Amino acid sequence: MGRILRGLAGGGDLRVVAAETTDIVEEARRRHGLSPTATAALGRAMTGALLLAQLLLKTPKERITLRVEGTGPLGGLVVEADAFGHVRGYVKNPRAEVPLREDGKLNVGELVGAGALRVDRSLPSGEVYTSTVPLVSGEIAEDLAHYLWQSEQIPSAVLLGVRVKGEGEVEVAGGVAVQVMPGAKEEVLGRLEANLKDLPGLTPLLRERGLEGALEALLAGLGFERTDLRALGYFQNEIPARFRCRCNREKALEALVFFTPEEREEMIVKEGGAEVVCHWCGEVYRFSPEEVRSLVAEVRCPDCGALWLYPKGDGTLARIEGETCRCGRKVELPSETRPQA
């Protein structure tokens, strides 16, 4: 389990969110069988999504989704997080790898390549606010800071770090986001810039001094007052963070509706049932022939649950009007697509 801290620095001129995500990133690595550099890429994105969720989400039921589409061998990644510290994510090519940089560090930028960062904010009403910005470096932290400035008009510093060891296991992972509040004093900004310039990097600080020690170095001379989260029910004064997927056995079975009855019957004949793998978390769901044959022609939106296709009383099928769901997701029906395994 990870944890998230929140607070203010510089006499209230700086809003700070920090996360320790070692266990979360290691679980993602294990679930998806990630290469070392893919681990760093997804780990940075998952940590960054947790930070942005604290900075941007206004209500408990909102979610934020980061989509990185690049020209590099990774093929892209997708991460989703909420304000409760829940995060999940995946990459398109989990075993993709590139040589180390000249300084011996993992080359996340080359693995991601040139492209764009898309950020979706999903509201309880089903509305989705989307913003897309070009990737600055593909290293994730710079790209998120660029997004905050270009799309949210929030000047921020974003630091993300993932260190792997041995066979690729995650040794340490975490991140910090510092948001400059309106009217911040010049001396506060000057001190923050000087501290950032003197930092040896976030990952060494996390490894040697932990999350609190990293914050002390980053905010030296600025003071850091932690937000009291106990009033919100977080008795340890921090938000627990964890890898948490919203998939379940019922949703996995519904995914088989995207196959025709003939295709499902072929699964039963050849495989003795059906198998569905969640692309978000890698969980495997197996279904018996009886379960597969019990499916009815009903398709719901994977995000908001709205009915897309359902049987009417006369036996015919009714289809949702339009090509976009109320939550903003593109409507995909069995004759139009196949689910991602």
UniProtKB/Swiss-Prot annotation:
One of its GO terms (biological process) is protein refolding. One of its GO terms (molecular function) is protein folding chaperone. The keyword Plastid does not apply. It holds the Pfam family HSP33. Redox regulated molecular chaperone. Protects both thermally unfolding and oxidatively damaged proteins from irreversible aggregation. Plays an important role in the bacterial defense system toward oxidative stress. Under oxidizing conditions two disulfide bonds are formed involving the reactive cysteines. Under reducing conditions zinc is bound to the reactive cysteines and the protein is inactive. Disulfide bonds join 245-247, 278-281. It comes from the Bacteria. It is found in: Cytoplasm. GO terms for cellular component: cytoplasm. It comes from Thermus thermophilus (strain ATCC BAA-163 / DSM 7039 / HB27). The keyword tRNA-binding does not apply. Belongs to the HSP33 family. Keywords: Chaperone, Cytoplasm, Disulfide bond, Redox-active center, Zinc. The lineage of its organism: Bacteria, Thermotogati, Deinococcota, Deinococci, Thermales. HAMAP family: HslO. InterPro entries: Heat_shock_Hsp33, Heat_shock_Hsp33_C, Heat_shock_Hsp33_N. This is 33 kDa chaperonin. Its main location: cytoplasm.
